[in-house]
Amino acid sequence: MESIGDAVGVVIPGASADVAVTGISLNSRTVEPGDLYVALPGAVRHGADFAAQAIEAGAAAVLTDDAGARLLALSSDTSVPVLVVDAPRNVVGPLSAMIYRSGQDTAPQLFGVTGTNGKTTTTYFITSLLRSLGKRTGLIGTIEILAGGDPIPSLLTTPESPEVHGLLALMREKELDAAAMEVSSHAISYQRVDGVLFDVAGFTNLTQDHLDLHHTMDDYFATKAELFTPARARKAVVTVDDEWGRRLAGSAGVPVTTLSTSRANPADWTVTETVPRGLGTEFTLSGPGGTVLAVHTGLPGSFNVANAALAVVMVLAGGVDAATLQAALDAGDPFTVAVPGRMQLVCERPAAVVDFAHNTDALARALEAVRSPEPDSRLIVVFGATGQRDQGKRPAMGAIAARLADTVIITDDDPHDEDAAAIRADVLAGAREAQEREELPCTVLEVFPRDAAIQRAVELARPHDTILVAGRGHEVWQEVKGVNLALDDRVELRSALTARGFNVLQDDRIES
């Protein structure tokens, strides 16, 4: 306890200084004996209101602010030391690193990926490539957490700081060699990766999203750029296909390796040739000193070429030589790994795909990726927009769907506490305005609830058509007015296809 007091500038009196602290928690319901309970101010209640439960569960001490201390002074139970600091959130990350000993010079080697789109797939690609290299790996991300064993469900793209450091400590105990982590802008803003030092940080792209949090693209960029500073990363790999990547490459505070998927944007590594192969792509990656790597990804879309290329260059930046990496690419085909809810194929005829595309850029790329070359094939898309999020992207998503699909079925995503009909109306307005202004030949429908929309898409589909169900990907719950309703797009799509007599693909990750 004394070392914790020293770290936050608080003197621990008497015998309390010898109290052992073995963990840290922000949630009174997850406190274990020996934990430091951090009582933070919340949107409705202060964490200090729940200190009694934390102490009863075995909390060794409480860390809070002045407001929390005043609430604790009213409590009859002050049997544990109380540490008071001005901004407790600011010290949670460093304290977590100290308590779990997950600081700068400890294993595993850590790869962090940020950007608007592609974080999940890139971290899966990194993990798969590292495994092909014979390394034991971990993963922290939107879909799951892996620590060398069975998958652990994840509710946040990046968990809270104590959980992140606890997971890194667990990975060290399991003697894992490396881990890949998604790093969202929310995680940086809410200090969930404070105290974490990434060996290699990677940047995918930046497009409109999360402006409900960041308000402007400049603010959004500034948050992402915080990852590329000496306090958070040793090296960086930056994709410079967009202006934000080029800006980041020029301003990052750590050594940068650049990557481009086009010769139009000069970079250290460039995708120089692409050849379609099945659903995926074979491509060459040309780098310094005339180095050329032959790479294949089995996932469709030019964006997955970018994701695979970023994974390759990040692993190279992590210290693997090009010849060893090429051998792993040849032997393991690591970028054909299935990523749940990311361009996930449920049926081949009709082609039926579920993808997480939930913003304008991702939806456009997904629609372009799944469009069949068959001249008589129609593209049917089912999607909606999330409630209580950036409202400006709703009509833009509707317009993009109208331009790129033959049949647009607008439905509900996660309304949260917003009116679902109002959200649909925003998306519909964009689709119908584009349809009228640009004289687009598409059909625009409004169908709800979401399972009915998926059924309608299947009813309309012929064997040579394509169905894209976009926006939710791997998610298995739909939040409506504070209630979580069971809803998995993959399950609904498989069920509707089966009912119509189509042969669906088997996947043990889809629980039908």
Question: Model segments located where?
Answer:
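ATP-dependent carboxylate-amine ligase
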Residues: M1-P13, A17-A20, T30-L36, G42, ...
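Short, basic phosphate-binding NTP loop
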Residues: M1-T114, T122-L133, A267-D268, D330, ...
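Residue-level signal for inorganic ion chemistry
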Residues: I4, D35, A54, L95, ...
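Well-ordered beta-strand positions
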Residues: L36, A61, V200, K235, ...
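Short, conserved loop/helix-junction motifs that constitute active-site signature segments
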Residues: I55-A57, S75-D77, D194-L197, L227-R232, ...
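Short secondary-structure boundary segments
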Residues: T64-A67, V183, N205, V240, ...
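Acidic, Mg2+-coordinating active-site environments of NTP-dependent enzymes
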Residues: A69-S75, F198-A351, G430-L440, D507, ...
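Phosphate-binding loop of NTP-binding sites
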Residues: V91-V240, W244-G253, V504
